[in-house]
Amino acid sequence: MIGWLQGERIQSWEQGGRRGVVVACGGVGYEVQLTSRDQNGQGTGSACTLWVHQVQRDDGSTLFGFCDQQERDLFRTLIGVNGVGPQMALALLDCCRVHELVAAIVDGDLKRLTQAQGVGKRTAERIAVELRDRLGNWAPLQEPSLSLVDRSDVKAIPLGEPCLRDLQITLETLGYEDLEIRRAMRAVASGPDVPAEDDGDAWLRASLKWLSQSA
């Protein structure tokens, strides 16, 4: 099985919605399917290093390539979920960067997961249920520690930055973890009675209520 390739990128290709490159290694050209992000990352004639997952079938084999080993490892984890094939796993990684996809799975963010081509709500739910615990402890794939005000999934929540910082400090002092706080805030923001953006006390009460009910 091929797990890693290093050579020269001699051609880019697209066919039927799929895309990739041909990598010349030791006089042999390997056709490798990539995400659109990785395909656009380098030009023809440039040096190319890819972590590879090989899928073997009766009619031949397909190579899926990734610029980062963690991305390749997450791809392998995704195809272990019932109903998730290599093309769907690649679509998920094309839609989100590694730490974003891990966060979406751990958070059960179905809206984010279903943005990937071919991923419906039921499949997104299955991915979240089967992988949440496994990826929650997968430290290398988690987003670097950030303040809530810097989190992309929190920026759209209608709460002023000073109140947001105070809310984070208070909930962390009470023993809640980052993921729990983010889930609570998104739940409150999508609920029927969203507190005013400058009413930190109301946000705290609503968040604590949601956290107690979800425990």
Curated annotation (Swiss-Prot):
InterPro entries associated with the record = DNA_helicase_Holl-junc_RuvA_I, Hlx-hairpin-Hlx_DNA-bd_motif, NA-bd_OB-fold, RuvA, RuvA_2-like, RuvA_C
Q: Does the keyword DNA repair apply?
A: yes
**Keyword DNA damage part of the UniProt annotation:** yes
Region Domain I: start-end pairs: 1-67
Q: Where in the cell is it found?
A: Cytoplasm
Q: Where is this region: Domain III?
A: 159-215
Which cysteine residues pair off into disulfide bonds?
A: none
Q: What does the sequence similarity comment in the record state about its family?
A: Belongs to the RuvA family.
The protein's assembly and partners: Homotetramer. Forms an RuvA(8)-RuvB(12)-Holliday junction (HJ) complex. HJ DNA is sandwiched between 2 RuvA tetramers; dsDNA enters through RuvA and exits via RuvB. An RuvB hexamer assembles on each DNA strand where it exits the tetramer. Each RuvB hexamer is contacted by two RuvA subunits (via domain III) on 2 adjacent RuvB subunits; this complex drives branch migration. In the full resolvosome a probable DNA-RuvA(4)-RuvB(12)-RuvC(2) complex forms which resolves the HJ.
Q: What is this protein called?
A: Holliday junction branch migration complex subunit RuvA
**Organism field:** Synechococcus sp. (strain WH7803)
Q: Which gene encodes it?
A: ruvA
